[in-house]
Amino acid sequence: MSVKEHLIHNVHKEEHGHAHNKITVVGVGAVGMACAISILMKDLADELALVDVVEDKLRGEMLDLQHGSLFLRTPKIVSGKDYSVTANSKLVIITAGARQQEGESRLNLVQRNVNIFKFIIPNVVKHSPDCKLLVVSNPVDIWTYVAWKISGFPKHRVIGSGCNLDSARFRYLMGERLGIHSLSCHGWIVGEHGDSSVPVWSGVNVAGVSLKALHPELGTDADKEHWKEVHKQVVDSAYEVIKLKGYTSWAIGLSVADLAETVMKNLRRVHPISTMVKGMYGIKDDVFLSVPCVLGYHGITDVVMMTLKSEEEEKLRKSADTLWGIQKELQF
């Protein structure tokens, strides 16, 4: 008899069924691994699968996490180049994509990434036909559209991480100004993730007290307190971090884990995330932009219709036109 047979008396023969709360992360770069560790620390999955094309790095990352299993509550961490390892995932997080090369046009980069997504998405769909797709790769609004087109999934199951992080950065910076924790500072950034995002100043509040009511110039050029700078800092923050450390990872990883928690626990929290906005705010094309969405186990179930000023709506439409200009040139 083996040590195991001497030690353990079997009472019930378990059938090896599949995991009930499986999450997959596609891409084990800095962002993918920040997502992975943030999800593991929140105990959101009973199985975590990692996928990448770089096999040595992939296996190394898996082993490194497995060796920390004692300190985690996720019993199974697996990896593989073959997408069969992702089978029966409830949530699949896409962080993979090509980086822009020197002198390369944005459209050329976008087209190269379309070709990568044409490999990733069908493989994900084949092995997890009922999953929710959470797209993180940038430019996230375009990739969410591409993932939706290629997957054939209904729009509520294809989600972009969108402005969830922009809004978190905004609330952090607002809290720094006021000396209050960011959880108690409320403000929404919507629209395109990144440079042309739209801060909704009318909704900025602490304990239900509107800052705009206290200070009508809030967010305008006439504002002597320069609150507009807070939004500029949000837009510039990723560039600053990239300049200093070469990439962003921790904040986006934490933001993605926040979204994953809402999905896996069916919390029905409202997040500023990228969804199909055709028919909203006068937008006529198939584009994905961030608006406040009710998120849960089935994906995005509802959109909260914000009361936007005419110039805010105009900014959203302008972003939509820019995105559509790129999207309509893509070859699927």
UniProtKB/Swiss-Prot annotation:
Keywords: Cytoplasm, NAD, Oxidoreductase. Homotetramer. It holds the Pfam family Ldh_1_C. One of its GO terms (molecular function) is L-lactate dehydrogenase activity. One of its GO terms (cellular component) is cytoplasm. The active site is at H193. The lineage of its organism: Eukaryota, Metazoa, Chordata, Craniata, Vertebrata. Pathway: Fermentation; pyruvate fermentation to lactate; (S)-lactate from pyruvate: step 1/1. The keyword Repeat does not apply. NAD(+) binds at residues 29-57, 99, 138. This is L-lactate dehydrogenase A chain. It comes from the Eukaryota. Substrate binds at R106, N138, R169, T248. It catalyses: (S)-lactate + NAD(+) = pyruvate + NADH + H(+). One of its GO terms (biological process) is lactate metabolic process. Belongs to the LDH/MDH superfamily. LDH family. PANTHER family: L-2-HYDROXYCARBOXYLATE DEHYDROGENASE (NAD(P)(+)), L-LACTATE DEHYDROGENASE A CHAIN. Interconverts simultaneously and stereospecifically pyruvate and lactate with concomitant interconversion of NADH and NAD(+). Its EC number is 1.1.1.27. It is found in: Cytoplasm.
